[in-house]
Each structure stands twice: as C-alpha cells, then as structure tokens.
C-alpha cells in the first residue's frame, strides 16, 4: 500500500528554539513511531525543513527549521520526500544541496527539485509516477532550487512525460495557511491537472486539514494537514494519511492522525465534526468573494498567533537566554 502524509518538520522552530521537535530527535526520539509502518508499504511525505550542517543565517536563526544530518541518522525515514516548499531554501543554496545529498546518500528518494521534479517507482506490480512542485512564493530567495510556480504548460508537459505509468500522483505545495477550504484558483488548477492525466492529487501547506473531491473519477485532497510539526493551535493537530491500495476494491482511502503535545502523529478513530473530512468536503466548492475568503484567512492567522504567544510566555523558562533575546529582538523588528 502507498501511504501519503502531509507536512513534516524535523527541527526546532521559532517559538521552541532549543526544546522543539529537533531537540527531541537529538535526544533519540523517532517522530514516526506512532505511524504503525509496515515494510511492505511505501511512505511519502513533505520535507518542510532543512537537513544540513551549514546555514546562511546567524545565531538562533541558524538553527530554526534546520537539523544536522547526523541527528536524523537513527530515524527510519519515509521512502520518498517532496522537497518543493517554502522552508527548504530557508538556509540558502548550499544547505538545500547538502540536504539533497544526504537523502541520496541514504537511498531516500526525493521529488520537487529543479533537477528531480518527478520519480517513477514500482509498487504492488504497478509503475507509479509522482511529481511535486510549489505554488507558494519563496520568502528566502528569488531563485529557489526547487520546482517553483510553474506555468500550466510546464505542468502539462511533466504529466505527459509520465504517460507510460499505470498511476500518476501530483504532490503540490499550495493554498493559504490556516484555512479549512481551498481558494477557487486551486480548484481550477486541480481540475486541469486531472484533465492532463493525474490520477491522484495531494495538497499541503495550509497546515490544517481541508476537504477532498472526486473529479472525473479521480481524488483530489486539497490539504492533508501536518504530520510532524510544532504547532499548538488545535485545528493544526488533525490530519490524515491517504492510502492507495491496488489490491483492494477501494483504491483510495484515508485514516485520521492526531498530532500530540510532542508534535508527533498517532492514529485516531474519532474526530470532532468540524475536522471531519467528509464535512470539509462540503466546503471545497464553497462560493465566497475574495475579500471574505482572505478575511477568514487573516482571522485564523490571528488565532494561530495568539496561541503561539501564550505558549511562548508559558515556555520562557525553557529558552536559553541568548535565544530569548534574539527572538524578542526579531519580534520587535517585525512590528
């Protein structure tokens, strides 16, 4: 079975520098321990941090969203990672290149870089083609080394290059953060990709679960939400694993995940109605004016930030003094 999850951050972040996910991994924790993985399954996830020994940042900011390769050596990695997202360039070109080299040296497949936009593998007797790109602007460089903001014609050409595959998957970093339904342009692009030959479209970036639709008999999951990520806001804790089983009468299915206080995922059976993906599916083609859509985006962002500030205050005693000063200084600069 193919198992697909959403956003994965192996590192410490902004509000937990020195005691976040990365620090737990350094101490020997495995973030995937709750996924009940089988050797016969093929796992895919979005690598939304940097794995390198180098950074073009300084002080505290050189360690946020970055972890050293040696610290990941004890983790049983997923089989394939997407490396096209808005955090992989956070520490510069050399860091991104080092991360790709680390994955290759450890025989871990990756997709979404400019030189490796797609991959083809065999699973359950089928040839699977998968491609990845990002539809989000990059905040750290004007020339990202991953496949960024492609034109429709370029997307079509890459899909057509997978024509000999039995099954084609698109893994897309897109949309707006912290909202539970897609923007209308995403729906348009998703339909276009299905018409070009994609059999399954998987989205991520909003950091919360969004709905799905079936278009021309093909599944489109607009956002899987987080898999491993240091976010305390409750809507960012619910996620799914998408299952693709060519030996089952039900080709595509899903299971729910919950992100615990250690920011690691575990399977759950029951989920609040507001996060139920069948409910969220009813919102996919929600007709709403641009102004109202983005008003909801910014309202949710304010709620997310409020939770972060409260958590920051609660954890002041966990910060190293120099990290605390750097974070406060950066916060004041941004204001």
Where in the sequence are the language-model features?
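Active-site-proximal segments of metal-dependent phosphoesterases and phosphodiesterases across multiple
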Residues: 53-74, 166-197
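Active-site environment of divalent metal-dependent phosphoester hydrolases
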Residues: 11-14, 51-54, 84-100, 115-119, ...
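A short C-terminal boundary segment appended to hydrolase-like catalytic domains
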Residues: 241-335
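Binuclear metal-dependent hydrolase catalytic cores centered on His/Asp/Glu-rich metal-binding motifs
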Residues: 13-34, 65-66, 123-171, 188, ...
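Acidic/His-rich segments in extracytoplasmic proteins that coordinate ligands and/or metal ions
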Residues: 59-109
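Conserved beta-sheet core of the metallophosphoesterase superfamily
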Residues: 78-80, 184-241
């Amino acid at each position: 079975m193919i198992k697909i999850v959403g956003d994965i951050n192996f590192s410490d972040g902004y509000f937990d520098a020195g005691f976040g996910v990365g620090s737990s991994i350094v101490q020997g924790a495995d973030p995937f321990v709750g996924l009940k993985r089988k050797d016969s399954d093929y796992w895919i996830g979005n690598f939304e941090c940097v794995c390198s020994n180098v950074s073009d940042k300084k002080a505290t900011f050189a360690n946020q969203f970055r972890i050293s390769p040696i610290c990941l050596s004890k983790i049983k990695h997923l089989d394939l990672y997407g490396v096209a997202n808005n955090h992989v360039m956070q520490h510069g070109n050399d860091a991104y290149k080092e991360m790709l080299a680390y994955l290759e040296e450890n025989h871990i497949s990756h997709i979404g870089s400019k030189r490796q936009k797609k991959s083809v593998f065999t699973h359950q007797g089928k040839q699977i083609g998968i491609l990845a790109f990002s539809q989000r602007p990059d905040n750290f460089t004007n020339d990202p080394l991953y496949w960024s903001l492609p034109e429709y014609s370029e997307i079509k050409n890459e899909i057509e290059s997978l024509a000999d595959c039995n099954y084609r998957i698109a893994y897309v970093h897109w949309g707006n953060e912290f909202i539970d339904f897609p923007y209308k342009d995403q729906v348009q692009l998703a339909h276009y990709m299905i018409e070009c030959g994609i059999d399954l479209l998987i989205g991520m970036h909003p950091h919360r679960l969004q709905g799905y639709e079936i278009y021309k008999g093909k599944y489109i999951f607009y956002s899987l939400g987080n898999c491993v990520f240091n976010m305390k806001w409750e809507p960012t804790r619910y996620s799914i694993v998408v299952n693709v089983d060519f030996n089952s009468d039900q080709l595509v299915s899903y299971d729910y995940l919950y992100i615990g206080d250690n920011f690691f995922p575990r399977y759950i059976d029951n989920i609040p109605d507001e996060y139920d993906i069948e409910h969220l599916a009813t919102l996919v083609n929600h007709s709403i004016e641009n102004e109202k859509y983005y008003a909801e985006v910014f309202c949710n962002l304010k709620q997310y930030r409020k939770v972060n500030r409260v958590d920051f205050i609660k954890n002041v005693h966990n910060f190293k003094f120099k990290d605390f000063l750097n974070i406060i200084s950066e916060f004041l600069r941004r204001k």
